[in-house]
Structures are given as C-alpha cells and as structure tokens.
Amino acid sequence: MLRVAINGFGRIGRNVLRAVYESGKRDRIQVVAVNELAKPDAMAHLLQYDTSHGRFGKKISHDQQHIYVHHQNGEYDSIRILHLSEIPLLPWRDLGVDLVLDCTGVYGCQEDGQQHIDAGAKLVLFSHPGASDLDNTIIYGVNHETLTAEHKIVSNGSCTTNCIVPIIKVLDDAFGIDSGTITTIHSSMNDQQVIDAYHNDLRRTRAASQSIIPVDTKLHKGIERIFPKFSNKFEAISVRVPTVNVTAMDLSVTIKSNVKVNDVNQTIVNASQCTLRGIVDYTEAPLVSIDFNHDPHSAIVDGTQTRVSNGQLVKMLVWCDNEWGFANRMLDTALAMQATQ
C-alpha cells in the first residue's frame, strides 16, 4: 500500500483524491493527509461538490482535523488535515508518508523536494513541470520506464505536455518528425479575473468570461525536456477560452514520410489499442469540448479533424480534460515510482 500525502488541495489536489477512488486504485493507494491553508468545511464541501466534475460518488464528512471518505459498507477512510505553510514543519515522518503529491503549483525544485524528504517522505511528485534540477520528468506512457530507484524527486509535467507528448511520440515513431507548432486552446484558470482587475500580465487583467486571451506558454520547453532531439524544433502559443474545463490542442508537424489522413489516424488507433491503451484515445464522433469532461485519458484525437497537406504537413486536433486526465496520470506515475523502490 502506497501511503500518500497531498500538499495543496486545489483543483489538481482534489481531483487526485477523487481519482484514487474513481479509478479503482484505492486498494493500492491510501491518502493519509492533506495539507491546505483553507478551512476544513470548505475543503470538504469542494471535494463533495464540483462544478466541473459533479458530485463525488462517496459521502464526505469532516471535523477540524480530518476529512472522512465514507464507503457503502459503513466503513470510512480518515484523512488528516494539516494547515502548515512551510514544508519543514510537515509531519510526514510521524504519519508514515511514502510519497508526497505536491499540488501547490508553488514548489517545484530539487530543494523543495528535499525538504519533503527531510520531513520524512520517501518520494516526491510535483504536479507541474518544475525546475530542470529534478531527478526526472515523467510523461506516463512515454518515458515512465526511465524511472529508477535514484529518482526520488520527480515532476509529472503539465496537463498539456501529457496531452501532446504521447501523440508526438506516436507520429515520430511511425513517420519521423522534422518540426512542429502547437496552439493550446485552454479553459480558463484561477489565475484569471472574473471581472477586469490588476495582474502583472496585462492580458490577464481582463475578464476571463468575456474574451479569448493569449497567455505565455513554455510547452515547447516541456517537449524538449522529454525529447532533447527536438530542441528548437517546436514552438507553441496558448490562448485561454471562456470554458471552465477541457482543453484542445491544435498540432501541426512536418514529417519525413509521405502520408495520407488514413495513415495518420490508423497509427493513432493502433497506439490507443496497444502501447498507449488508457493514455491515448481516438474518436470520430461529432463531439465538442464538454463531451471530454471527466475523461481519464491524457489525449483524445478527433480523427475527423486530421488534415494532411502535400503529404508531409500533418495537422491534428487533440482533446484532454486538463484536470481529470492529469490527476489520473499523477496516480499512475506515483505507482510507477513506488515500483522502483
């Protein structure tokens, strides 16, 4: 049993906890503690009721020191609530924590991870790309087999790298990629404003519900971290759109082979049924973004939108639930880290 603590109980932290139960991994993962500065009643309420993902299928209750996840047989899981703002104060040793899922979005370098380990955790997994000094960055399904026992402090990448990197790998393995560009069409996030208000990024001073808003992205750097051979070969831009969840990615790549649309799509289908089963999915149904809400895959390719120009310029539309898919990959990576120890 992997004993897990969640540091940061925001969008990803709460989705990770739900995913432990909804993905059927509760028999392998036990969440023993959550560290969050918010009040226990708000933590429990937002775990039970979620605007994007609906009501949690488990009954949730709480007191000032615990969240309780109730099972139908009358038993319940008790999760310790902590409200500590500094990592060295966290009682991971006393709680017997094996692995910390750091979902704060604040911490992400080797020193931060080492503080978790010094506090008693054995392993640390960050929920964002993190610094280059981490032991490894894992995009599950692509490079998780590179994990070793020496990799104690790891990043799970970002939701967008988890979406696009598996597709890049499939295309490169099959056809060879020369270069590419990506446009991320991302749902609004909590670093945006409800109405116009001050922000360091002037575009993010504007109301999230009223505009399509360009934002900076380092997605191309995330691709290079996983595939060093693509250094300076990919560029990316990102826009935020007035939806609360689900992201679309417009991928264009130049390839070394001459292909047709069916060649590209069939390659994705094959991967989704074999090497990337559960990670990549494929559809030709006439779906829209809401239809991918709460989808656990990292990437879903809409085959009806695949285009090929002059045999070697390939354009694809790839969907992901940027919260739920990523939360499920956090758990997959956590178990993969445990398996190396």
Swiss-Prot record:
Superkingdom as given in the UniProt entry: Bacteria
* Pathway assignment: Cofactor biosynthesis; pyridoxine 5'-phosphate biosynthesis; pyridoxine 5'-phosphate from D-erythrose 4-phosphate: step 1/5
List site positions: Activates thiol group during catalysis.
Answer: H186
The residues that hold substrate are S158, C159, T160, R204, T217, K218, R240
Q: Which GO terms describe its molecular function?
A: erythrose-4-phosphate dehydrogenase activity; glyceraldehyde-3-phosphate dehydrogenase (NAD+) (phosphorylating) activity; NAD binding
Indicate the principal place this protein occupies in or around the cell.
Answer: cytoplasm
Recorded catalytic reaction(s): these are: D-erythrose 4-phosphate + NAD(+) + H2O = 4-phospho-D-erythronate + NADH + 2 H(+)
Location comes to: Cytoplasm
| SMART domains per the UniProt record, alphabetical | Gp_dh_N
Q: Which InterPro entries match?
A: E4P_DH_bac, GlycerAld/Erythrose_P_DH, GlycerAld_3-P_DH_cat, GlycerAld_3-P_DH_NAD(P)-bd, NAD(P)-bd_dom_sf
Q: Name one Pfam family in it.
A: Gp_dh_C
Reported EC number(s) for this entry are 1.2.1.72
Q: Where is the active site?
A: C159 (nucleophile)
Q: Which UniProt keywords apply?
A: Cytoplasm, NAD, Oxidoreductase, Pyridoxine biosynthesis
Residues at which NAD(+) binds: R11, I12, N322
Q: Name one GO biological process term.
A: pyridoxal phosphate biosynthetic process
| Subunit description | Homotetramer.
**What role does it play?**
Catalyzes the NAD-dependent conversion of D-erythrose 4-phosphate to 4-phosphoerythronate.
Which family would the database say this protein is a member of? Belongs to the glyceraldehyde-3-phosphate dehydrogenase family. Epd subfamily.
The protein's name: D-erythrose-4-phosphate dehydrogenase
Source organism of the structure: Vibrio cholerae serotype O1 (strain ATCC 39315 / El Tor Inaba N16961)
The upper taxonomy is: Bacteria, Pseudomonadati, Pseudomonadota, Gammaproteobacteria, Vibrionales
Q: What's the gene?
A: epd
